[in-house]
Curated annotation (Swiss-Prot):
Pathway entry: Polyol metabolism; glycerol degradation via glycerol kinase pathway; sn-glycerol 3-phosphate from glycerol: step 1/1
Gene3D superfamilies to which the protein is assigned, alphabetical: 3.30.420.40
Source organism of this protein record: Streptomyces avermitilis (strain ATCC 31267 / DSM 46492 / JCM 5070 / NBRC 14893 / NCIMB 12804 / NRRL 8165 / MA-4680)
Taxonomic path: Bacteria, Bacillati, Actinomycetota, Actinomycetes, Kitasatosporales
Gene Ontology CC entries for this record: cytosol
Entry protein name: Glycerol kinase 3
PROSITE patterns, per the entry: FGGY_KINASES_1, FGGY_KINASES_2
């Protein structure tokens, strides 16, 4: 009998395969990083072939670590870094270009031109998104316009698009030999090409980017027993296992954090931060810089929508301290170093390396450290980096409360940065509400597993999934209201200093 569900978690810096039991507990996992390709300032790419090879390896190694066979898996889910764009030849599986990553800003002129022409409001109304470098539509257009032969190939049916969920799914289900070219509603909602009401590709939006509809994958529910097919026996699993769930990473974390009721929210701390608030079957149009997106759709049930605040640089700011500045040797050292000081000493670090995402949407912003004096040392910079993660989250929480009218009583958190206890305490202090971390911190992979397991009957319903969630640790706010207000005022002033640095044509 198949007693487990697996999940491919294809992220920005790594790919992992995780295996869960009926109680939602982790049984085994394996993870491998892939290269970050940085050809020039503002450009971020990944090698799709390397990602597929890593996917093969992590599946095989996780099964081996768990002493399991493929037949022990009832189903597989896929979750992924959203927006990251792959265009490949379906005849042979060869990418025409590297994957253009969600952080990449090369399409800033495309986004700016759409806004100037008045088309930004069309995109907001239909897709729920502002025209921004973040989303896939402009990335596809850039490849069509700048990579030799791709436009012609697309017109002949020899170039197809997918985010990395689609790329992994296509390869797992056969690749050039009948691979399924499909995605789910959550990933499609991040392209600027899907109408949120019809849950289908929109011809007017496609026309804005001059993208042939034939390039695009079929859009399916996030959880479905048949829509995504089965793994091919010639592929890494050597068995036909149903792929029954697909979700973008932040929507998967929302499912994994069991935020199934309107008003429930979670914040994932990874390379960036992503705060998602369930708004139920109601489409809430943001007036304060947030995104309207699809949270999930299970089977034939109506789609559940969400408001999202996406922050480009949070955990990657800690990586910057490690890799570029070399003031720490590991991410964990950021906490140790930050604890050497009592506060930030009056300095603020705004890590706008890729511009500012929600709620500002300023691609012209660039990173800044302000308030420096000779007194400051590495401890203050480490502390300011952790505070930057938390202040950016407060920006989003305030916008979310204005849009929804929902006051946050507790913030559910997950992701790698939540292992940093000091950062989570700072988050509670800056927000003024408790912060709660679950026992199973890998909620992104868990959410993909839940979607697959629900579709195949491994789990009965969301009520059963709620019983799995347990709190591991809670942080209560300790700052006074005066300190909280003073700190946030300083942060807002620092943000102003980052604007108008990068010219947008």
């Amino acid at each position: 009998m198949a007693d487990f569900v697996g999940a491919v978690d294809q992220g920005t810096t790594s790919t992992r395969f995780m295996i869960f039991d009926h109680a939602g507990n982790e049984v085994a996992k394996h993870q491998l990083e892939h290269a970050q390709i940085l050809p020039r300032s503002g450009w971020v790419e990944h090698d799709p072939v390397e990602i597929w090879e890593r996917t093969n390896s992590v599946i095989q190694n996780a099964l081996r670590h768990g002493n399991l066979s493929p037949d022990d898996l009832a189903a597989i889910g896929i979750t992924n870094q959203r927006e990251t764009t792959v265009v490949w030849d379906p005849r042979n599986g060869r990418p025409y270009y590297n994957a253009i990553v969600w952080q990449d800003t090369r399409t800033d002129s495309i986004a700016a031109a759409l806004e100037r022409s008045g088309q930004g409001d069309v995109i907001r109304r239909k897709a729920g998104l502002p025209p921004a470098t973040y989303f896939s539509g402009g990335k596809i257009q850039w490849i069509l316009e700048n990579v030799d032969g791709v436009r012609e190939a697309a017109e002949q049916g020899h170039a197809v698009f997918g985010n990395t969920d689609c790329w992994v799914l296509w390869n797992l289900t056969g690749g050039p030999d009948g691979g399924i070219h499909a995605t789910d509603v959550t990933n499609a909602s991040r392209t600027m090409l899907m109408d949120l009401e019809t849950l289908d590709w929109d011809d007017e939006l496609l026309g804005l980017f001059d993208i042939p509809r034939s390039m695009l994958p079929t859009i399916n529910p996030s959880s479905h027993p048949e829509a995504y097919g089965q793994t091919r026996t010639s592929r890494p699993l050597r068995a036909a296992i149903p792929i029954a769930g697909v979700l973008g990473d932040q929507q998967a974390a929302t499912v994994g954090q069991v935020c199934y009721a309107p008003g429930e929210a979670k914040n994932t701390y990874g390379t960036g931060n992503f705060l998602v608030l369930n708004t139920g079957t109601e489409l809430v149009r943001s007036q304060h810089g947030l995104l309207t997106t699809v949270a999930y759709q299970f089977g034939d049930s109506p789609a559940i929508y969400a408001l999202e605040g996406s922050i480009a640089v949070t955990g990657s700011a800690v990586q910057w301290l490690r890799d570029q500045m070399k003031i720490i040797k590991s991410a964990a050292e950021s906490e140790t170093l930050a604890r050497t000081v009592e506060d930030n000493g009056g300095i603020y670090f705004v890590p706008a390396f890729s511009g500012l995402f929600a709620p500002y949407w300023r691609s012209d912003a660039r990173g800044a450290i302000v308030g420096l004096a000779r007194y400051h040392d590495n401890g203050h910079l480490a502390r300011a980096t952790l505070e930057a993660i938390c202040y950016q989250s407060r920006d989003v929480v305030e916008a979310m409360e204005q849009d929804s009218g929902v006051h946050l009583d507790v913030l559910k958190v997950d992701g790698g940065v939540t292992a940093n206890d000091l950062c989570m305490q700072i988050q509670a202090d800056i927000l003024g509400v408790p912060v709660s971390r679950p026992v199973v911190a890998e909620t992104t992979a868990l959410g993909a597993a839940y979607a697959a397991g629900l579709a195949t009957g491994f789990w009965q319903d969301t009520d059963e999934l709620r019983t799995h969630w347990q709190e591991s640790k809670r942080w209560e706010p300790q700052w006074s209201e005066d300190r909280r207000a003073e700190g946030y005022a300083g942060w807002k002033k620092a943000v102003e200093r980052t604007l108008d640095w990068s010219k947008v044509e």
